[in-house]
Amino acid sequence: MSIKTTLKLTALSALTALAYTSHAQAEGKLTVYCSVQNVVCEKVTQAFSKKYNVDAQFVRNSTGVVLGKIKAEKENPQADFWFGGTIEPHLQAAELGLLESYRSPLQKDIMPQFKSLMEQRGNFTSVIYLMELGI
């Protein structure tokens, strides 16, 4: 799968998932906790805003910081959606009951080596990008 295809799938997956947030649909506003590069956060939220006529804003933090915020905000969530970051904190948040279940229809397009993970844990997370951390 090419990087261009991967980036397109990332954007499509994010837009599809963002469209299902009830808060955004009800109030015309969306707050996204974003744990990827700032430029990606900006492009995804801008594309969503344009496509769905919703005021989408993002708060950029590392995955660990976002997990801490979500834990602290359990009784009064301040964001509608968490996009990006490493998978372990997403799985931990799901186990703690901090995330709503959602399965992306685009999971069928995930590379074969990640299919089993998505079949087991895909109600709370989805592979949206792949990045080398070292060689």
Where are these regions (language model features)?
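Short, flexible, glycine/charge-rich loop motifs used to bind or transfer phosphoryl groups or to couple energy/partner
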Residues: S22-H23, K71-A72, T125
